[in-house]
Amino acid sequence: MRNWTKFLAGLVAGGFVLSATAALADEIRVGITMRMVSENGQKYGQMVMDEIGLINEAGGINGHQIKATLMNDECKSDKGVANANKLIFQEKVHLLIGSTCSSVSLPIVDVTAKAQVPQIIPHSTNAQITQKGSAWVFRVPVSGRFYAGVNAKYVGENIGKKIAYICAADAASQNDCDAMQAQMKSQHGTDPAYVAQVQEKEVDFRTHMQKIKSAGVDGIMVAALAETMARALVQSYEAGIGPDVRRIGSSSASNAPVPKIAGDAVKGVFYAAAYSDADTRPVARLFNEMVRKRYGIHAPDHDFSQAYDLIRIVEIALNNAKVSLTSSSLKADRAAIRDAIAGIRNYQGLASGPISFCSDPSPVCRD
């Protein structure tokens, strides 16, 4: 097991982590901004850095080393934008990876579009990210627009149509709540039985849970980041809402902090996610074992798998990009990397299906 003390301290401080390689004149510079305020979040960032380090150890990209710079945006939009500006204009990165939270990725899309820097998303699911029409953004994770359709079909057919909603204020959760309600209306003709808008880091759900209990619902959807979701699940049982009322989670229910914090309250929660550690494919078994050995995570979630797939896609694109890597070629090199990512076709990794991109700046090409 690694000694994480110095690494974690640097991330909490919000500063730079050591680069994956020393500065070189013909290096490929990659900037990364992610939410690293939890143990899992810190390990997502470390895995990305470790994988880039392994690429460098194997000879790099067409003989060029990758200089990776990792920053912690704490899921705060202002910090994410500041990180992006620093990485783009001071570090002069060729490619930006980020962020974890949709509320951070959304404003960064405007920054990268204006600066003409390719941006690839590791975790954010808010559908608006690729609806902005930016020619510079790509998304590896499944868009929230797809989750909503799947969730609503299952819920309406197997749980019931009288659903209450707890919606946290972060952009991904807001999108998940809105999309789920729209899909329940479209597929089953039903309106929400109850909707509660809560803070991103809400700690007290008791009043809402009492009202939901009185409403006699079939299910409760909790759309929130992992820690907030876990608290809501626990308090739903404390309010006396029995297991016959199904709990429905947004995709963050797959994140390790949820069962760790919620304990028995997580039992029976329905959610859709892009990856499961129960996947029996050889590639998934190898990945699960790697994450367990390196990072001590027994059940890797889809944020681990999506970050890993992202690095593999970036590796392919960088190898295919025709770059000069001189002081005067930065603009052209950024465009070449953007075009190489757009050229990715049928990447087969940890996701349940192939990942492809294309040049049109639309959700069809960029999700």
What spans do the regions from the language model cover?
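Sec/Tat signal peptide C-region and signal peptidase I cleavage site
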Residues: V17-A25
